[in-house]
Amino acid sequence: MGREQDLILAVKNGDVTGVQKLVAKVKATKTKLLGSTKRLNVNYQDADGFSALHHAALGGSLELIALLLEAQATVDIKDSNGMRPLHYAAWQGRLEPVRLLLRASAAVNAASLDGQIPLHLAAQYGHYEVSEMLLQHQSNPCLVNKAKKTPLDLACEFGRLKVAQLLLNSHLCVALLEGEAKDPCDPNYTTPLHLAAKNGHREVIRQLLRAGIEINRQTKTGTALHEAALYGKTEVVRLLLEGGVDVNIRNTYNQTALDIVNQFTTSQASREIKQLLREASGILKVRALKDFWNLHDPTALNVRAGDVITVLEQHPDGRWKGHIHESQRGTDRIGYFPPGIVEVVSKRVGIPAARLPSAPTPLRPGFSRTPQPPAEEPPHPLTYSQLPRVGLSPDSPAGDRNSVGSEGSVGSIRSAGSGQSSEGTNGHGPGLLIENAQPLPSAGEDQVLPGLHPPSLADNLSHRPLANCRSGEQIFTQDVRPEQLLEGKDAQAIHNWLSEFQLEGYTAHFLQAGYDVPTISRMTPEDLTAIGVTKPGHRKKIASEIAQLSIAEWLPSYIPTDLLEWLCALGLPQYHKQLVSSGYDSMGLVADLTWEELQEIGVNKLGHQKKLMLGVKRLAELRRGLLQGEALSEGGRRLAKGPELMAIEGLENGEGPATAGPRLLTFQGSELSPELQAAMAGGGPEPLPLPPARSPSQESIGARSRGSGHSQEQPAPQPSGGDPSPPQERNLPEGTERPPKLCSSLPGQGPPPYVFMYPQGSPSSPAPGPPPGAPWAFSYLAGPPATPPDPPRPKRRSHSLSRPGPTEGDAEGEAEGPVGSTLGSYATLTRRPGRSALVRTSPSVTPTPARGTPRSQSFALRARRKGPPPPPPKRLSSVSGPSPEPPPLDESPGPKEGATGPRRRTLSEPAGPSEPPGPPAPAGPASDTEEEEPGPEGTPPSRGSSGEGLPFAEEGNLTIKQRPKPAGPPPRETPVPPGLDFNLTESDTVKRRPKCREREPLQTALLAFGVASATPGPAAPLPSPTPGESPPASSLPQPEPSSLPAQGVPTPLAPSPAMQPPVPPCPGPGLESSAASRWNGETEPPAAPAALLKVPGAGTAPKPVSVACTQLAFSGPKLAPRLGPRPVPPPRPESTGTVGPGQAQQRLEQTSSSLAAALRAAEKSIGTKEQEGTPSASTKHILDDISTMFDALADQLDAMLD
């Protein structure tokens, strides 16, 4: 074997001459027929399995390789490691030897014992040309070696950038990135990104990210971020964070990247990585200051003092959701804990740590699904280089319980239109709540847009935070026009915005497509795809960031008269010539543009197309609103004089019934809640949709929840506006914005009241009423006999939305007077107890004609006028009366059941002691709160149960109490213009005292047939029921509006206290008071219908008949001390002096005559209805009740005279 060893030695030494001699001898022996027995073995292998060709390939000598191949050397001979000559040639990276071996048909995909092919070696050592040649000869880059690594893995692991780019540009790039040849369950499974991150190859990582590799792909060790953090690759960590890696992902050891850094590294690089990870994740670390546990709450997080808690999110009730990881036990605990027991350990940059406990801090939406709170920032001018985000201010007046909600938290709040509204702690407005499963609302609730609100309201809101955005970010105000954003600063703004989430590479996509900042805020995922954002991860990230933008409304809120003006408002005046040349030279034609027509015209940029179509859509909305406004104004002239009430019942589960038809809009353009949808969809004109003050991505929950009751805490009584002020300054629901004017007011009228919906009125003529000048009165109508009330059901919220009818077209010759000083807006928040399933399916309550009239639990308020008194009101069986009624919105029989249910007291009816009336106060807006007025010279209550005037009630008025007090719904009158009525619904938010059983027939008779004295004047306080009395229950139906007097000047109708005879205390007031205190609202006392009747007296002014001991008085919370003093009415001439027996007897006779007249009127009404063939069930038992009433009345009058 000497010659073989000589050959190997010659090849190793590169002795080409010696190799040629040895090879020549081999050739010579082949030509002989009888050759030597000792032939030269060219494929001889040494102890390591190396052949001469192995050595030649390893040495890279082309001549030697060629000589050996000519001598018939085996090209794919393997050594002891399974390596072939091509492996060594590729390892050396010499191109020509590889080409020579490949031409000799060397196997390109032959694997060694460790599973490597020549491409593995070339890629590992970065031989670009060799790798390229191997790929050209069909080398498979997806083959894995025994370590489960592909050539791309090796190139990325060792930082071979060019080879990695070569492999990524191959046709098998997707397979390489997806790792199709690998088993994810393999413990050795890895990805090119992990290998590059482990070794800190930033450029390779950048190439992988550009190629679209999944950045959050996990292995046993976690994500690539785990690898970079573990090995201290700070720049790689920063690069991965810029690429959008999820920092909250845990590996199989339940560790995040931050956990790994904290546990295993202590270098300077680790400190930088910690800061980067904390900033990127938005993790809020807190340390427990004391132990906390709650065994009664399974969702509570039990903590010990010193525990480090990771805050995940915040519950709407103010608690924080935290996570405690116990590394020693390897367990995790998640639950809720109060923020007051912890201190901040780590926080995001810019968040004041001192404020976090008082204003709970949610986390970044991209990771924890909760909005990022703002940081305090110094005031600086508005810049366009940063886009605003949605956030919630820690300065929210609602405090730390209601200021921030969690989009993904457990027990998230219900729909804003039908859910709970949180009451602010300082009385300025409700807290901002975030609605679950909705786009993050804008903090634009605090933005006051010019021209849309009265100056006073704008001034009122000016002190509140402008917008809630993160540090260094500003809100674009309404004054920013699109053309201003296009003046060179828009590109910078878009670039900075995209840089915040490391996608600045798409800046050119937005700019080339013609998108500016306002239009980006309206982009959809489809629009992103159209401009070239094709990667799903990037598209999802940008779409989520767009949803968080807070851009003020920029579309024109009016219909321009000129096309150029409209284009300038959109910031696209350059298309004026193209539109005109294409025939779109007027606003009417532009309103019909479509996407296809824009392309035909020459508007090729997608952003410009988007903006033009948004403008066209706005024009269509404005036109539709104008048409609805015209229809509304025409229908308003035919409205019946009587007020119409629409009660919207909210279902207990927060979901309203599905409504057919188009979605209705509020004044701000946001969708109404399901309850309002259901209530308004039944009929009548739709509300006028005005231009929204905010973009759809900024719809405020507060704007859609205004007017909703069902507050979480006991509401405080709203103070009364005692001082005269403009009507538009009346008490609105807290935190609401003023709606813009719908249309010009009717002649002689002030601004329209603040209402949500204008129910359609009747086109017919109004019903005949009493002669002009007749005083206006309350009329409580009797219904069917009171039945034992049902136990209280779960409370449900109702909204009383009413609109007074206009005075135009009245057939009674009413004189229109100035309204601006007397007409005020009214909005009341009430609750109704749950009704039957029928009520749940049809929450709309509106007047309907004839017997099927559903009646709402409210009473109409009308101003009283001077003049001759009206005849006694007739017994009414329906709200409609003789006048035709407008078409009903809903024919549901549900409200009938509610008509016999218990009455509720309105939230805006705090109580006070009863006091005498006086002349009308100066005209001013009526407050939502009803209150009492002190009588002249401290006279006792005019109709109280005793002459002392309930001292305990006056003592209760010295302090302001938030808790409800037993009270009843006293009637109240408000000065309103001619033909305008308001409806006050009553609520069950205040418990009532049980009725005095002995006097129940008396009160029934008095209130039903008008013998009770009149209520005080418009400026006078309301009478209050005594503790032993109870207000009438809801068995009485709605009074007929048209039957009440409609004209005259308000005048005091109740006599002075001097006319009252000495009144003994009512039976058992103390007993009833104690009983009332024990009564828990389990059952409601029986109801008593009532009607207040005015009869003529001896003087020129009407002198109502009064019966003692029938006054409805109640004690309520003290009204707000800010109310100014009210005028003290002077005593009337005919009511001065003492009351003698003769006067008492005269009053008794007058009372008897009035009762007889009322009885005759009732009998006549019954007879008329029976003749018409439409007897009402509510009148069947009237005559039976009257005899009992008279007996009780006679006993009471005798006791009173004694």
Curated annotation (Swiss-Prot):
<dbReference type="Pfam" id="PF07653">
    <property type="entry name" value="SH3_2"/>
</dbReference>
<feature type="compositionally biased region" description="Low complexity">
    <location>
        <begin position="1031"/>
        <end position="1051"/>
    </location>
</feature>
<feature type="modified residue" description="Phosphoserine">
    <location>
        <position position="877"/>
    </location>
</feature>
<feature type="domain" description="SAM 1">
    <location>
        <begin position="489"/>
        <end position="552"/>
    </location>
</feature>
<feature type="compositionally biased region" description="Pro residues">
    <location>
        <begin position="966"/>
        <end position="978"/>
    </location>
</feature>
<feature type="modified residue" description="Phosphoserine">
    <location>
        <position position="396"/>
    </location>
</feature>
<feature type="repeat" description="ANK 6">
    <location>
        <begin position="220"/>
        <end position="249"/>
    </location>
</feature>
<feature type="domain" description="SAM 2">
    <location>
        <begin position="558"/>
        <end position="622"/>
    </location>
</feature>
<feature type="compositionally biased region" description="Basic and acidic residues">
    <location>
        <begin position="731"/>
        <end position="740"/>
    </location>
</feature>
<feature type="repeat" description="ANK 4">
    <location>
        <begin position="147"/>
        <end position="176"/>
    </location>
</feature>
<dbReference type="InterPro" id="IPR036028">
    <property type="entry name" value="SH3-like_dom_sf"/>
</dbReference>
<feature type="repeat" description="ANK 3">
    <location>
        <begin position="114"/>
        <end position="143"/>
    </location>
</feature>
<feature type="compositionally biased region" description="Pro residues">
    <location>
        <begin position="913"/>
        <end position="923"/>
    </location>
</feature>
<feature type="modified residue" description="Phosphoserine">
    <location>
        <position position="403"/>
    </location>
</feature>
<feature type="modified residue" description="Phosphoserine">
    <location>
        <position position="725"/>
    </location>
</feature>
<dbReference type="InterPro" id="IPR001660">
    <property type="entry name" value="SAM"/>
</dbReference>
<feature type="compositionally biased region" description="Pro residues">
    <location>
        <begin position="1124"/>
        <end position="1133"/>
    </location>
</feature>
<feature type="modified residue" description="Phosphoserine">
    <location>
        <position position="858"/>
    </location>
</feature>
<feature type="modified residue" description="Phosphoserine">
    <location>
        <position position="892"/>
    </location>
</feature>
<dbReference type="Pfam" id="PF00536">
    <property type="entry name" value="SAM_1"/>
</dbReference>
<feature type="modified residue" description="Phosphoserine">
    <location>
        <position position="471"/>
    </location>
</feature>
<dbReference type="InterPro" id="IPR035499">
    <property type="entry name" value="Caskin2_SH3"/>
</dbReference>
<protein>
    <recommendedName>
        <fullName>Caskin-2</fullName>
    </recommendedName>
</protein>
<keyword id="KW-0677">Repeat</keyword>
<dbReference type="Pfam" id="PF16600">
    <property type="entry name" value="Caskin1-CID"/>
</dbReference>
<feature type="domain" description="SH3">
    <location>
        <begin position="281"/>
        <end position="347"/>
    </location>
</feature>
<dbReference type="Pfam" id="PF16632">
    <property type="entry name" value="Caskin-tail"/>
</dbReference>
<feature type="region of interest" description="Disordered">
    <location>
        <begin position="676"/>
        <end position="1104"/>
    </location>
</feature>
<dbReference type="GO" id="GO:0005737">
    <property type="term" value="C:cytoplasm"/>
</dbReference>
<feature type="repeat" description="ANK 2">
    <location>
        <begin position="81"/>
        <end position="110"/>
    </location>
</feature>
<feature type="modified residue" description="Phosphoserine">
    <location>
        <position position="393"/>
    </location>
</feature>
<dbReference type="InterPro" id="IPR036770">
    <property type="entry name" value="Ankyrin_rpt-contain_sf"/>
</dbReference>
<dbReference type="Pfam" id="PF16907">
    <property type="entry name" value="Caskin-Pro-rich"/>
</dbReference>
<keyword id="KW-0963">Cytoplasm</keyword>
<feature type="compositionally biased region" description="Low complexity">
    <location>
        <begin position="940"/>
        <end position="949"/>
    </location>
</feature>
<feature type="compositionally biased region" description="Polar residues">
    <location>
        <begin position="415"/>
        <end position="425"/>
    </location>
</feature>
<feature type="region of interest" description="Disordered">
    <location>
        <begin position="355"/>
        <end position="460"/>
    </location>
</feature>
<feature type="modified residue" description="Phosphotyrosine">
    <location>
        <position position="253"/>
    </location>
</feature>
<feature type="modified residue" description="Phosphoserine">
    <location>
        <position position="409"/>
    </location>
</feature>
<dbReference type="InterPro" id="IPR033635">
    <property type="entry name" value="ANKS1/Caskin"/>
</dbReference>
<keyword id="KW-0728">SH3 domain</keyword>
<feature type="modified residue" description="Phosphoserine">
    <location>
        <position position="878"/>
    </location>
</feature>
